[in-house]
Amino acid sequence: MASTCVPVLTRSRPELADALATAPGPRAVVMTMGALHQGHLDLVAEAARRVGAHGTVVVTIFVNPLQFAAGEDLDASPRTLRADVQALGDALTGPDGALVVGRLVVFAPTPEVMYPGGQPAVRINPGPVATVLE
């Protein structure tokens, strides 16, 4: 059996910029929170089909703390980066062992990378309508 191609793993904005600076052809992005399953891999395969052999697929893996409300368990959200990167490489490796796209880039930042000044606080005051709709 042929070996699996390894995606380019980036963890910071400069690393991502460097990876994309030389990335070939058209690009497609698939945004995820990780813990990839077949549905994610199908989206990545479709992205690869659309950009073709000379394009670049970027997969983001970011568990965004802003997506969790107070009382929801951010810490319980699975973190499976190593397995996710392996699954992506497996999914986009052709029968000859070559990557089926020009480049596969994984961007897996930490919250500190995404929010260098700390998490932004957004407050929305919907006014009196909120009391009616609650």
Predicted regions, residues:
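Nucleotidyltransferase catalytic core that binds NTPs
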Residues: 2-134
